[in-house]
Amino acid sequence: MAKVSELDVQLIAATAFHAPQGVDWEVDEGASESEALVEFAGRACYESFDKPNPRTASNQAYLHHILEVGHDALLEHATATLYIRGLSRSASHELVRHRHFSFSQLSQRFVHSEEAEVVLPKFIAEDEQLTRLTLQAADEARFVYEELLDALESKLEEEPNALLRKKQARQAARAVLPNLTESRIVVTGNYRAWRHFIGARATEQADTEMRQLAVTCLKLLREQSPVLFDDFHITTLADGTEMASSPYA
């Protein structure tokens, strides 16, 4: 029986900020490096390192002002990289439509799908009979995949390059793998792009799996740079899932 995978998202890299020499400006204690960089970039536009406006003197107040007035281009200077596992292949195709991100995704051409897990949609996972039926379909697809793989490798046996032979066989056989096959992907984006993704995909109208991913990303990014994401409000829907919204997204 196919093994079910659960969503797992980890922050693996984020912006490091090094204040330049010769600039009379100090980073607020407690500000993340991403938050410090965004503030520095904004103050660099106007040479306001002396913080002349008391209403935006602190890092938190300055960044909140940036979001309020829509000067979010400054957020493009800070980036975060997340490693996502337990995402269905179908959901990954929605994710890669966000073209301001950079992606490195698990290759079905090079990696044998023998051990690949599956991701069940919420409404299927909640029903024992539907779960059994879906896992049965996944097992049958895996069986056909293995049969095709063996047949294709035999068909390509005259190819002297073993690596090329396996790659050609897998790239053809993967056509029968279902959309619920788990994918793994590294995603890097600037904070403006992450905010756009969360604003678009954490809504009640979004696909359930994508909404779960967006809310999970929000929670991680808010831990890393709380001021840049604390305008998002997370609420629980009637079905027990979560959504997020912001007046600025």
Swiss-Prot record:
User: Would you say which domain of life the source belongs to?
Assistant: Bacteria
Q: Which GO terms describe its molecular function?
A: flavin adenine dinucleotide binding; NADPH binding; thymidylate synthase (FAD) activity; thymidylate synthase activity
Which residues participate directly in catalysis? R201
How far does the signal peptide extend, from start to end residue? none
Which residues are noted in the entry as FAD-binding? R97, H98, R99, Q105, N190, Y191, R192, H196
The set of disulfide-linked cysteines is none
Q: Which GO terms describe its biological process?
A: dTMP biosynthetic process; dTTP biosynthetic process; methylation
Give UniProt keywords alphabetically.
FAD, Flavoprotein, Methyltransferase, NADP, Nucleotide biosynthesis, Transferase
Q: What does the record note about the cofactor?
A: Binds 4 FAD per tetramer. Each FAD binding site is formed by three monomers.
* Motif ThyX motif per UniProt: ranges: 97-107
Which reactions fall under this protein's catalytic activity? dUMP + (6R)-5,10-methylene-5,6,7,8-tetrahydrofolate + NADPH + H(+) = dTMP + (6S)-5,6,7,8-tetrahydrofolate + NADP(+)
Question: Could you say which residues bind dUMP here?
Answer: E94, L95, V96, R97, Q105, L106, S107, Q108, R109, R174, R201
Q: How does it assemble?
A: Homotetramer.
Which family is it part of?
A: Belongs to the thymidylate synthase ThyX family.
Which protein are we looking at? Flavin-dependent thymidylate synthase
Give the originating organism: Corynebacterium aurimucosum (strain ATCC 700975 / DSM 44827 / CIP 107346 / CN-1)
